[in-house]
Amino acid sequence: MAFAGVGQGIGTYDRTEQASGAPLGRVTSRAHFTDIHPSDDLPAQTEENRAREVGHLARQLTRQSVTVTDDSTDVFSYQEGSDLDPFSDKFNAKKWTKLMFEAVQTCGPARKAGLSFRNLGVHGFGSDADYQKTVGNLPLVGIGSLRDLIGNRKRKVQILNSMDGVLEAGEMLVVLGPPGSGCTTMLKTIAGEMNGIYLDESSSLNYRGITPKEIYGQFRGEAIYTAEVDIHFPNLTVGQTLSFAAEARAPRNPPGGISKKEYAKHMRDVVMSVFGISHTLNTIVGNDFVRGVSGGERKRVTIAEASLAGAPLQCWDNSTRGLDSANAIEFCKNLRLNADYMGISSAVAIYQAPQSAYDCFDKVSVLYEGEQIFFGKTTDAKQFFVDMGFHCPSQQTVPDFLTSLTSPSERRPREGFEGKVPTTPQEFAARWKQSDKYQELLAQIAEFENKYPVHGEKYREFLESRRAQQSKHLRSKSPYTLSYGGQVELCLRRGFDRLRADPSLTLTQLFGNFIMALIIGSVFYNLPVTTSSFYSRGALLFFAILMSAFGSALEILILYAQRGIVEKHSRYAFYHPSAEAVASALTDIPYKVMNCIIFNLTLYFMTNLRREPGAYFFFMLISFTLTMVMSMLFRSIASLSRSLTQALAPAALLILGLVMYTGFAVNVANMRGWARWMNWLDPIAYGFESLMINEFHGREYECSTFVPMGPGYEDATGQQHVCSTAGAVAGSSVVNGDAYINLSYEYYHAHKWRNFGILIGFFLFFTAIYLTATEFITAKKSKGEILVFPRGKIPHALLAQSTHSHGSSDDVEGGKFAGGSNMKKEITGADRANAGIIQKQTAIFSWKDVVYDIKIKKEPRRILDHVDGWVKPGTLTALMGVSGAGKTTLLDVLATRVTMGVVTGEMLVDGKQRDLSFQRKTGYVQQQDLHLETSTVREALRFSAILRQPNTVSIKEKYEYVEEVLKLLEMDGYADAVVGVPGTGLNVEQRKRLTIGVELVAKPALLLFLDEPTSGLDSQTSWNILLLLRKLTEHGQAILCTIHQPSAMLFEQFDRLLFLARGGKTVYFGEVGKGSRILIDYFEKNGASKCPEGENPAEWMLAAIGAAPGSHSEVDWHQTWINSPERIEVRSELARIKETQGGKGEAALQNKDYEKSKAEVKAEYAEFASPLWKQFIVVLMRVWQQHWRTPSYIWAKVALCSLSGLFIGFSFFKAGTSQQGLQNQLFSVFMMFTIFGQLTQQIMPNFVTQRSLYEVRERPSKTYSWKIFILSNIVSEIPWAILMGVIIYFTWYYPIGYYRNAIPEDAVHLRGALMFLYIEMFLLFNATFSIMIVAGIATAETAGNIANLLFSMCLIFCGVLASGSSLPGFWVFMYRVSPFTYLVEGMLSVAVANTDVVCSDIEFLTFNPPSGQSCGDYMSTFITNYGGYLVDENATTACEFCSMSKTNTFLAQFDIYYSNKWRDFGLLWVYVVFNVIAAIGIYWLARVPKNTGKERASEPEDVQEKQVPAQSTEKKYQSISRSSESTVA
């Protein structure tokens, strides 16, 4: 039923009325979501007007009967503006739903799904490798994995244990439990997403007569799982995204007799209306890097897309994440209506479930560490546990109460039940199974199974209904709705939509390739049709074929970027992954054709390649065919691998092998027998051979150089001279092209079209692999949350538990350690914390008339409007407001963290201006938990303590303080745990505690700012965080904290509240009061409706001021505040604080400074707490540690350098000193340079990781200087560069045999040492060049593209493909600028200079001397002038002459001279130093905020203005907008 899911969001149904016995059908016209970030396209006033109109409409329609303004009963034929028009304000969702349901019934019975499960168990397989991988222990991991594989030692890990339940069609189930309890696994199991997890054999599931195997296979799209992450194509509009989903599941014969496209468009419009995103129809979806709709709107796009899948059984995993509680309630009410009218069954996991949302559900399942402790009606759950002996506080919501039962620190037994209530998950599960409710459930399951036997009547009805919707051309058991051709067509249209939406990459590549063609064409401009162009023509065709072949290498990255989306759509049964693969390849063909024409046309005619129509079109044919072959090859690699790392590693070596064995760098005759097969399997080799044949076959080339020639040989005729080129015949002034390629390359004309056929075969083979792998190989299986420790530091509690099934490193849920209460109890320091160690604070921070203005699209916008307030020691102040009110922006302004716009107003510490040290004396806990993933918890805290506490405090004292904070935050049990990444490392709560700890160990002397500390956490964790903050304030900490719609219990923990309306306007600042009484009284006396008993004051307050969805207030609350006596009191208090504290502060400051030395006073008010030298040592050690603990980075370097060295070394094994041997040695150096790009791609992501952490958290808190950041990252690469140099030296230098060339002049050691130094300079240049390029660029990908372009330029102009003397005059400067010029000269001269040349048989030139002369007599003058040697000087016929006798002659052809070796070495140091200086300069120019230092601290705060340079405004604004809620998508 492709339309059924639309009902998920239709209308707003009030479940509480039905529960109380009121008639069914209380509906508003649509679901109104208040967005996290309002749309950038609408000014604030427009948003407010829209909210007011929506509220008015809601009030009109919320009554027992719905007023119908259009008598039409055809859901698809309606008048514009009627109540069936999705774009009308009168749209009546309930009426539309009823009519749609009736229309569907005329086409046959609607499909419905429910399920029962008995003894449901789910398991995975894990291993014991739960220690941190480092460069040192990674080999041990490999050995252990091999042992496990051979011995099949993987442990079975039980995730879910013996669960039972039943969900009828049209029922809603809420799944409650803390992270790690099994909620996600349960939903995935129901929906059939069993990637890496397995059903126990004893499990029994019945989907109304359908077996699990069938629901996971042929009915895959009928039960879907929607994850909490939002994955979409960022450059498609919302309309395009949802249209695609609607068309993919549109039935074969839509109701109403309309076409499938009309049906899909109508369904899209309805869904957008229902979810309140109609205004985003033509707005791109966006993501974290591409600006599009806001985060809340993107979440609704995800929900709408899943709704359009039309599944009768839907599983939603924390889909309300990113929505505030009011919008979460709206989402659940929409699901309720969907269930009641369309019969859709849904199972929903919610971490923070408001009571109103909970009331929408029929049933609840409570999970506790993989055990089911309740399943039944939502109305029965609370009483069940109360009867068991637990106490539910009056102000605690039912879902919070149920979740709290899984936390030993939160659950409370009723009086008289101490010691009688269960305490472990197993005891809870046992009590549940002994209860009457459990017996009732078993009876319901038995009744369900009797009613719906497997493959019974309901199964046949379901099958017939599904088949009626499917295309006629589908096989009977296909889960898809469209035929395969229809799927390809749909994906193809989407592909071209994506191309039109973002043509930048395509156009950039076209332009870049055109520029490259111009550059290469100008380097080889107008080649003469003589033998002097032979080498150049070969080099040109070699480079041209490589450009055609490797232009598709980026497709690996592109495919991985969309892989998650394709797999999601496959789970929804939108299309076969292979259909998208076909469409993706077809979408790229126009670009490939254009690129082939633009690049090859320019190159071909600029360089004077064979100007014949047939030759030109054959050149184009081979180039395009090879492009397609290589595209399929790279796509096959991407689809065969499960992760990007797995794909890139073999791709790098494959590229090297393909280039090496093309036939130019090593010709066929010189390929070693054991490596010849690589040439046979190399598609590029066949293309290169055909192009060489195409260029040289049947052509005669004028000889440009004869032997002998010059003075004394003017009369040489006939066979007395010969052209100095392979294939020449004595006496002939021309050389046959066929003879040249036959002798030099062993290429033959008969292979020309054969090779084309082989390329077609390669194309078909790789295409088949690509499509097959895409269809059957999914991305890497996910692992659950586990804690990772350095080897040898795993806590005994974890080691003990690892012998059992729980807590595996592969535990999909991972709650057995990371979130499990039993384990948590054993390893945490609960009840031992001493919060008294927190530094007592005495300073009062106050602000008055704070205004913040910025420019958006050249229009001024006020973000904060005359905000007043203060934070006193020992108080916890909440900062709340509607979405877009500027809460985070106010924190940033107060903490001196904004670097753009204009800030005015007073911000005082004890009545005095903030000084330069203000930022490092305050703690700022950001919403994002950013930490270096390789550090342990203790190391992260020590790093902060060392650099941010005063330098006068000893290291020992700092470390002792860290230990105290670990105990205070109850982190000592996992102090040695590695931060890791989400899933493999700290869980959400542990990360939040670490974020707070990093700021606490800095001993903030003034106050602590926290931005949304409970965001994304479950209710239990949120409560723990608030209790921690409360504990801190009780010991003197001053805290200002933003929070988004807290529960009533959380809200009561705050002392004061600063509430902002949209536009940064103050609505209230004052005490909250016991039971929120003071706050409630203020609003009630100023016109708000009375707060009902038991209502959450935070939610009531939002509704009172008109900020909740669908609500509106006639009171101007900002103006009310301005005119209130409370504000007058606030202003008076601010004046008093400034007067009294200012005087005290001045006196205290003088006394304190009097007792200190001048140096101590200077240090106290310095920008950084530690001196630069100390910063450098500490930061350098951390960067080094990061590298050591990222074995994938270092071992990838080792693998690349060693395998490339061995590959090149043995491909040119024992290269001789013949002319071909010398050319091989030249190309062995050239090929070694090709690893430059891969090394760069390895360095840049690590640098960006460090930089992100530094810029977002460490720089604003003044932890250390940006200069130290750059230098430490550069210096840390030096040891690894030295190690890689040693590896390359031994794997490359000795196999090729360079050392043998130094034996004649007894310089083996000197030249060997020089070669090692040059290798090190190559690697040092690579490291510093990489950091210089990425220093000022946002992403590693962009920097990598720029680096590759510059690298290509350096390679083209280094003198190998075209010598400096042969370059056009215009490009000579590039030859001089390229650092590779000096690397090639230095390395090659040191490698082969000053030794003899020994020609091979085919390199000798044969001619006859004049009658009566010997060969030696005839050639003596020529040899004296030009060099070379004769085989037999006394011969009188058939003189065999080698045109070179010394390797220096060969080197001179490339303008390489051994005498320049030390000059070149010195110049390379100049390049390295330049890179370092440029890296520092570029970073300062591009990324260091300007004018944020002394000027800000010294200027009077009431006139302070800061305007950022124009070039950084937009980027910085985007950063602020994502965190501040002050801007819109």
Curated annotation (Swiss-Prot):
Residues 144-394, 845-1087 form the ABC transporter domain. It is a multi-pass membrane protein. Disruption phenotype: Does not affect the susceptibility to azoles, but displays slightly lower minimum inhibitory concentrations (MICs) to cycloheximide and higher MICs to rhodamine 6G (R-6G). Causes further increase in susceptibility toward fluconazole and itraconazole, when AFR1 and MDR1 are also deleted. GO terms for molecular function: ABC-type transporter activity; ATP binding; ATP hydrolysis activity. It catalyses: itraconazole(in) + ATP + H2O = itraconazole(out) + ADP + phosphate + H(+); voriconazole(in) + ATP + H2O = voriconazole(out) + ADP + phosphate + H(+); fluconazole(in) + ATP + H2O = fluconazole(out) + ADP + phosphate + H(+). Residues 1518-1529 have a biased composition (Polar residues). Residues 1493-1529 are annotated as: Disordered. Keywords: ATP-binding, Cell membrane, Glycoprotein, Membrane, Nucleotide-binding, Repeat, Transmembrane, Transmembrane helix, Transport. It is found in: Cell membrane. Residues 1493-1505 have a biased composition (Basic and acidic residues). Induction: Expression is induced in the presence of fluconazole (FLC). The chain crosses the membrane at residues 510-530, 539-559, 589-609, 614-634, 648-668, 757-777, 1193-1213, 1229-1249, 1268-1288, 1314-1334, 1353-1373, 1465-1485. GO terms for cellular component: plasma membrane. SUPFAM superfamilies: P-loop containing nucleoside triphosphate hydrolases. Belongs to the ABC transporter superfamily. ABCG family. PDR (TC 3.A.1.205) subfamily. Pleiotropic ABC efflux transporter that confers resistance to structurally and functionally unrelated compounds including azoles such as fluconazole (FLC), itraconazole (ITC), posaconazole (POS), and voriconazole (VRC). This is ABC multidrug transporter AFR2. It comes from Cryptococcus deuterogattii (strain R265) (Cryptococcus gattii VGII (strain R265)). The lineage of its organism: Eukaryota, Fungi, Dikarya, Basidiomycota, Agaricomycotina.
